[in-house]
Amino acid sequence: MANDPIHQFQVSRWIPIDVGGVDLSFTNVSAFMVATVVLASGFLYLTSSGRGLIPTRLQSVSEMAYEFVATSLRDSAGSKGMKFFPFVFSLFMFVLVANFIGLFPYFYTVTSQIIVTFALSLLVIGTVIFYGFFKHGFGFLKLFVPSGVPGIIVPLVVLIEIISFLSRPISLSVRLFANMLAGHITLKVFAGFVVSLSSLGALGIGGAVLPLLMTVAITALEFLVAFLQAYVFTVLTCMYINDAVHPGH
């Protein structure tokens, strides 16, 4: 069981809850999602409550995260898109903290569950659709008719644009889920090699050096991937929000 690279993604029911035949149990995934929100909120509170003129290192990290999201949203959707800043910033911090939490031993990576990443993606696309129709009415549908397209191929282009739009939550969720899943499986496999070889005596310990070095290298790479996936998720969210703010562009 310890060497099974898939076991780390198992969903365990901690508090069974059944409501009308619907399983609403509190699981390890639920617990670490709550932990993610608490840690992210606590970090932002502690780093934003300082009164000193010179920011601490943690304050600087918090400010960089703020500026990154604000700049990405402003560049993608303009000043009108800044009303979505709390939403996008919350998504960024949740994905980032969830990714980092999962890199520590015995901690769960909630973003390795497709149901979690797909729910986040549906939240993004649902917000885009709701705001698009709320703000522009049926003018939001201009999103599916790019300007300058010859009339004869408009039906084909509209069909392609609709399929592309509907595939966004799938691509957005699978990208995050697959990267976190693959990275953790690879890390677990190399760590398993280290444990297995070390149990073979002196010769095995010598042979475990290379897998150990690979494990350290992959761990460092996973921290980079954890940030990059939060970065990509946020940038794409900003681009999708631009479609809701400026559907005719």
UniProtKB/Swiss-Prot annotation:
The chain crosses the membrane at residues 26-46, 84-104, 114-134, 143-163, 185-205, 208-228. Its main location: membrane. Keywords: ATP synthesis, Cell inner membrane, Cell membrane, CF(0), Hydrogen ion transport, Ion transport, Membrane, Transmembrane, Transmembrane helix, Transport. GO terms for cellular component: plasma membrane; proton-transporting ATP synthase complex. Changing S171T: In strain: 133. The keyword Cell membrane applies. It is a multi-pass membrane protein. It is found in: Cell inner membrane. Belongs to the ATPase A chain family. This is ATP synthase subunit a. The gene is atpB.
